[in-house]
Structure formats: structure tokens, C-alpha cells
């Protein structure tokens, strides 16, 4: 039993790493399925480029949209801002607003970057797309010293149907694949450098120590778990009370429940202040004596570490 708890705790502590690993495996598997089952390069000048680009960038765009859909931070920032724009940028705090949006974009870009990396390292989509370009620069790169036949047959190289000698066809295919893999590694290096710089900057400007930040993360995780449990329990009780009142044809019993303003406040992105020993908007709300509070009174300063409750 203790061993099971140890394993469970390990997976819980490493759930972010495990999540990214699973995402990477799914991305690689999806790319291989696309390449072997769905992708068939037309090998015509007019269709190679749009066809290859659609398979290269199309899934990345879809994954980006899905990333926004599943982003809790995005919906916390966006929900209700059309009716009340101050929710997004209270008191014109565009810096805090921009920080929040950048973090949303950062999280949403993980899956698309993984897809682009895997697709470029494989090279199939890139080979098809670039071979269909009728640009002088492309022709000069691939068909230098190979004559006009290479220019006319380049779009057929990915399919192996060109009239070029086999060794030239293989050489062109290797050149296309090498370019694709260079771009793939460039994407990886760029993403890693940006992630490193962002992490270093985030920790450098942190207003809390490392140990307090560790405690903060644990607290937010526990608060999130307890919130889900309490929400489920109270929703069940409220449903039971309403149904009992309906079927008994009696007035419902009094049921204490947070008002709209309370929900608005605890749903806001937390603003850290050194003068307050609070770790979430929920804690700040329950410990404040005066609860007639509007989130617009305080500018939104996005937490540097992006810890959030729900």
C-alpha cells in the first residue's frame, strides 16, 4: 500500500512532465499516421506547395485553437470582458493584461510547436511543399548545375516519378529533407531558448522566495482539489433542496450561498501584494472584513509564476 502511495505521489508531483511527455508521444504518433495514411503528395507544380503547407501548418493551427479552448487562464481573463472590459485590463493596466495574454499564448503554443518540430524532422510535408515552388531562389538552390530538366522535374522528386537519374533524384530528396530537419532543429532551439529566458526572467523578478513559492504551489493545488469537492457537494445539496421543494410543493429551505459579486471576485486573477499574506483571491476574500469589494478597484497584476485556482 505504501509503495502504491509512493508511486501515486510521484505521478502527481510530475504530472506536468508526464503530461508533456504524453503530448509528445501523441504528436509523434499523429504525425506518423498522417504521413503514412492520409498524406499523398500530388507531385504537380500547382498543388505541391498548398497541399504540403496544409498538412504542415493545418494541424498546428488546430492545436493552437484547442490550446486556447482548454486554457483555464484564457477563460478566466476572457469571460465577461465583452460586457465589462475592465475585467481584462482593470484601470487601464495594459502591462498586466499583456502578461496574462502572453502566458495564455505561451501555454497554447506548446502543442503546435511540438507538431511543427516532429513534422519538420520527418520532412515529408516540407519536401512536398518546397518542391512545388516555382521561385528562382528555390530553383537555384536545388537545381544549380543540374540543367533545365531538374527545374521541370523537381515537383516530381518527392514521389520518385521524375525522369532524372536515380542518383540525382536521391540527392534532391536528401537536400529537401536536410533543409526540413535544419528548420526543425531551429524551431527546437528557438523554443528552448525562449523557454529558458522566460523562466529565468520569471524567477528573477519573483516577489517570493523559492520555498514560499513551493508552498504557494502546494496550497493552490490543494485549494483547487478542495474547491472541486466542495462545489460538487454544494451543487448536489442545492439540487436536492430544489427538487425536494418542487415535488413537495413547498417553499424551499433557506440555503446560504455566495452572491454574484463573491463569484466575480474569486474568479479574478490573483494580485500579489507583499502587504497581504494571501495566496489566492479566495483567501483574500474570506479574510477581508468588508466584502463589498469590486475587482476593478485593484489593477490586475498577473502573478509572475502563474499559479491559479481553477
Curated annotation (Swiss-Prot):
Any one of the GO CC terms: plasma membrane
Main location class: membrane
Domain of life (superkingdom): Eukaryota
Topology term for the membrane: Multi-pass membrane protein
Pfam families the record matches: Ca_hom_mod (PF14798)
Stretches that traverse the bilayer: 17-37, 49-69, 101-121, 181-201
Keywords: Ion channel, Ion transport, Membrane, Transmembrane, Transmembrane helix, Transport
Key word 4Fe-4S present: no
InterPro entries: CALHM
Subcellular location: Membrane
GO molecular function, one term: monoatomic cation channel activity
An example Gene Ontology biological process: ATP export
Family listed: Belongs to the CALHM family.
Entry function: Pore-forming subunit of a voltage-gated ion channel.
Protein's UniProt name: Calcium homeostasis modulator protein 5
Organism: Danio rerio (Zebrafish)
